[in-house]
Amino acid sequence: MSVISMKQLLEAGVHFGHQTRRWNPKMAEYIFTERNGIYIIDLQKTVKKVEEAYYFLREVAMNGQGVLFVGTKKQAQDSIREEAQRADQYYVNARWLGGMLTNFKTIKGRINRLKELTKMEEEGVFDVLPKKEVTKLRAEKEKLEKYLGGIKEMKELPGALFVVDPRKERIAVLEARRLGIPVVAIVDTNCDPDEVDYVIPGNDDAIRAVKLIASKMADAIIEGRQGEQLSVESTAQEQVEETAQEETAVEA
């Protein structure tokens, strides 16, 4: 059974590309035709590419690595947050801060500051501080939460990135490439597919299209994490059985 159907892709409008004057010739192999000045994406290729990305992210999750969802354009923000949270993963949906990957040590310092402010608020420290200072601290906390809230539990670099519109998220893609982190992305007809390891040709501007593909990537991660859990449980069971066999052998 395929990961995604042509019907699902059509209903979500994944096949609508950009205007023909706004295109990247490198995307030619993924274009089916042109209609009323708009490129139509070949959904047969999209089905295949979604499957490739699905199995890759499932493998990443099975290996116990995290996946960072990135989509800061308005149409992607909610889906990126919702699907990353559903898969218990990390996300950036407000703005990519330069160095989020390549200077992760510094970013971790800002995350620690966010956690410190959150703890202060929870423990009632804000209640005893001067009002002016509390206003300033709350503003700092809100800003950090907006930009770093989705990665505050990310203790190490992710095993992969899932990106909506690599053209807009170019800095994130470049940082990942520099560090050798594979990139899975929804790539529209105006993007450069060469910058992406797992290209999913599709409409990156329609909310339903982004939601559909992001949800499939989240499904892959959830499936992979269940596989990782089963693998850990299986190994533990084998160790218990081996110990029991050794004890039996010693007694004999």
Curated annotation (Swiss-Prot):
Q: Which UniProt keywords apply?
A: Ribonucleoprotein, Ribosomal protein
Named from the GO MF annotations, one term is: structural constituent of ribosome
Among its keywords, does the record have tRNA-binding?
no
Q: Where is this region: Disordered?
A: 231-252
| Annotated Gene Ontology cellular component terms | cytosolic small ribosomal subunit
**Composition-biased stretches (Acidic residues):** 239-252
- GO biological processes: translation
According to the lineage, what is the superkingdom? Answer: Bacteria
InterPro entries, sorted:
Ribosomal_uS2 (IPR001865), Ribosomal_uS2_bac/mit/plastid (IPR005706), Ribosomal_uS2_CS (IPR018130), Ribosomal_uS2_flav_dom_sf (IPR023591)
Describe the family membership recorded for this protein in Swiss-Prot or TrEMBL. Answer: Belongs to the universal ribosomal protein uS2 family.
Protein name as annotated: Small ribosomal subunit protein uS2
Name its species: Acetivibrio thermocellus (strain ATCC 27405 / DSM 1237 / JCM 9322 / NBRC 103400 / NCIMB 10682 / NRRL B-4536 / VPI 7372)
